[in-house]
Each structure stands twice: as structure tokens, then as C-alpha cells.
Amino acid sequence: MTNQIEKELIEKVAKLSNLKLKEEEIELFSNQFKDILSFIDKLNEVDVKDTLPFYELQIEEKSEREDIPTGSITNEEAIKNAPQAKGGFFVVPRVVGEE
């Protein structure tokens, strides 16, 4: 990837994440992104053709608990500490459809 594409990708991800990044941060994340891709390339070079896949790494027995219904909090209790609420619902900033 070229440096320009990496910067554009970082800027796009920041916008989608609703983050405002400084130019130094974009450069830092771009370099980190480059390092991550380099590491992935190294992993792709590893010969694993004779290695069996791991399906489950946890060997110990799994214990399941009985599913017992319990009480829950009321709607009023749930929203009492919310920064904003309207009509019994949480009010949050819009994050979808802003492009």
C-alpha cells in the first residue's frame, strides 16, 4: 500500500468512527498500520501445510449452569443515569447515514 492510500484509509476509518485526528496521529496510525500489514505478510510466509488446525484449545470440561430467570431493573432505573433520555428511551448521537 502506498503511504497516500494508508492515510486515506486512516482518515476514512476515523470519520466512520466519529474521531477527529490530528495530522501527527494520522501519520502515527498510518505507520502502525504499515507495521501490522508487514507482520501479516510474515505470517503468510510460514509453512503450515503439515500442521493440523486447532478446533478447541480449551481442554478442561465445560460446566454449564442452570438457566434460572431472575428479576430485572425497571425502565426508569435503566435510564435514570443516562445523559439524555426521551420517552423512556436513551438519546444518543446519530452515527449512521452521515456520509
Curated annotation (Swiss-Prot):
InterPro entries: Asp/Glu-ADT_sf_sub_c, GatC. It holds the Pfam family GatC. It catalyses: L-glutamyl-tRNA(Gln) + L-glutamine + ATP + H2O = L-glutaminyl-tRNA(Gln) + L-glutamate + ADP + phosphate + H(+); L-aspartyl-tRNA(Asn) + L-glutamine + ATP + H2O = L-asparaginyl-tRNA(Asn) + L-glutamate + ADP + phosphate + 2 H(+). SUPFAM superfamilies: Glu-tRNAGln amidotransferase C subunit. Its EC number is 6.3.5.-. Keywords: ATP-binding, Ligase, Nucleotide-binding, Protein biosynthesis. One of its GO terms (molecular function) is asparaginyl-tRNA synthase (glutamine-hydrolyzing) activity. GO terms for biological process: glutaminyl-tRNAGln biosynthesis via transamidation; regulation of translational fidelity; translation. Gene3D superfamilies: Glu-tRNAGln amidotransferase C subunit, N-terminal domain. The keyword Protein biosynthesis applies. Allows the formation of correctly charged Asn-tRNA(Asn) or Gln-tRNA(Gln) through the transamidation of misacylated Asp-tRNA(Asn) or Glu-tRNA(Gln) in organisms which lack either or both of asparaginyl-tRNA or glutaminyl-tRNA synthetases. The reaction takes place in the presence of glutamine and ATP through an activated phospho-Asp-tRNA(Asn) or phospho-Glu-tRNA(Gln). NCBIfam families: gatC. Heterotrimer of A, B and C subunits. Belongs to the GatC family. This is Aspartyl/glutamyl-tRNA(Asn/Gln) amidotransferase subunit C. It comes from Sulfurihydrogenibium sp. (strain YO3AOP1).
